[in-house]
A protein has these predicted regions:
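Carbohydrate-associated surface elements
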Residues: 109, 130
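A short helix/loop element that forms part of the nucleotide-sugar donor recognition site in Leloir-type
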Residues: 137-155
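Conserved donor-binding/catalytic core segment of Leloir-type glycosyltransferases
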Residues: 156-172, 178-181, 194
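Nucleotide-activated donor-binding/catalytic signature segment of Leloir-type glycosyltransferases, i.e.
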Residues: 207-229, 233
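Short alpha-helical donor nucleotide-sugar binding micro-motif in glycosyltransferases
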Residues: 237-242
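Aromatic "clamp/platform" in nucleotide-sugar-dependent glycosyltransferases that forms part
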Residues: 250
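A short, well-ordered alpha-helix in the C-terminal region of glycosyltransferases
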Residues: 316, 330, 336-337, 344-358
């Protein structure tokens, strides 16, 4: 078997890039003949099709990337195998997806979303994303490198640090977390909340809205937003610096930070919905709040990015659920429990580590992807 991997390559410290790069590492370590390529680099991809002659091209992304991940390799006779996340609904490419022998999805929620919007369930196999469990390991708060991070963030030894990571914090549930933390601030005031976000125009606007909310709640002085790039090598230390990973995402097809935090022995506070409920075990590796609100849309504007020749408005026969908001009372209860019961947190942290070791080792993921391709893609095993 010879595989070409199409993803955000060269690797960047971002979710889809990490997903692809860990698959590449796992396949290589398993002895599979494979090479990575940038999903948007048409010239390089065509050159690799002709010179490398892969038996299949595994593409990492969402359905909007289908021109790069599926249509392009197929034009050159290469069997495409997309490994897809979701963004709430599938607006196009149903025929192209249904013509494939194998579609990998990152969670059952992603599969359900695609099936609701016209993709055959028989085509899809759930394959969670892998985690580098040798890099993401538990470290004590007394570790010099962990203490250095907490000191740089201004977190005292007796304060609990909550961490959220995302392109923007609001999509990862930061506003729900702020409301929850404000509810319990008088009962347990010794906490700090740090959000790691990407510096971009959209994020800047969203940050201002988040800060306004924090100001109105009287907790702005306890909120820190980090911008700029952090390397993959640094992230295990940042996770270990926190006491709770707070990720009640509004939309989440998997939840890579949730898994990485658990690998570091950090309990997760999130929401019982979407891909998250498949990565976090409520009461065992973290706390999952109920859904406070289901967000539905009845129409959506689509255009070139979604494969249409021009902008148009698509109206649905019935509303589609595309996101959630976590119940803030539940989040407050979970946060208070995790911040005040160190013994339970210790047990959850140990269980979280075992959970990731059993279910999300990137090497096991790579072997399963290899087996699925050999089983489902005609000619891949012998190529």
């Amino acid at each position: 078997m010879r595989l070409l991997l199409l993803y955000d390559y060269p690797p960047q410290p971002a979710g889809l890039s990490t997903q692809g790069d860990l698959l590449f590492r796992g396949l290589t370590e398993a002895g599979v003949d494979c090479l990575p390529a940038p999903r948007t680099g048409d010239l390089q991809k065509e050159w690799m099709y002709k010179c490398y002659k892969p038996s299949a091209a595994v593409g990492i992304g969402w359905w909007g990337y289908l021109p790069e991940l599926v249509l392009h390799p197929r034009r050159f006779g290469i069997a495409p195998v997309p490994w897809l996340v979701a963004d709430g609904w599938v607006a196009n490419y149903q025929d192209e997806l249904n013509s494939l022998p194998l579609i990998l999805t990152t969670s059952s929620w992603v599969s359900e979303t695609y099936a609701r919007d016209g993709i055959s369930h028989d085509k899809m196999v759930v394959q969670p994303i892998g985690c580098d469990i040798e890099s993401f390991v538990p470290l004590p708060k007394s570790h010099p490198k962990i203490r250095a991070i907490r000191e740089s963030l201004g977190v005292a030894d007796d304060e609990k640090l909550l961490l959220t990571i995302g392109g923007d914090a609001a999509s990862k549930g930061s506003q729900e977390m702020m409301i929850a933390l404000a509810k319990i601030d008088s009962e347990f005031p010794k906490w700090r909340y740090v959000c790691k976000v990407w510096k971009q125009e959209r994020t800047e606007r969203q940050n201002e809205l988040d800060f306004s909310l924090a100001e109105s709640l009287g907790i702005r002085h306890k909120i820190t937003y980090l911008e700029g790039v952090l390397s993959r090598e640094f992230m295990p230390y940042l996770y270990n610096a926190c006491d709770i990973y707070a990720g009640p995402s509004r939309q989440e097809g998997f939840g890579m930070p949730h898994v990485e935090a658990q690998a570091c022995g950090i309990p997760v506070l999130s929401v019982d919905a979407m891909g998250i409920k498949e990565t976090v075990v409520h009461g065992e590796t973290g706390f999952l709040a109920g859904v406070g609100e289901w967000i539905s849309i009845g129409e959506c504007e689509v255009g070139v990015e979604e494969g249409y020749p021009e902008r148009r408005l698509v109206k649905f026969p019935e509303p589609k659920v595309v996101a959630v908001r976590a119940n803030t009372d539940d989040l407050a209860e979970g946060a208070l429990q995790l911040m005040t019961d160190d013994k339970s947190v210790g047990r959850m942290g140990s269980a979280a580590r075992r959970h990731v070791e059993r279910n999300f080792d990137y090497r096991d993921v790579a072997k399963r992807v290899m087996d699925l391709i050999a089983e489902r893609v005609p000619g891949a095993r012998s190529a």
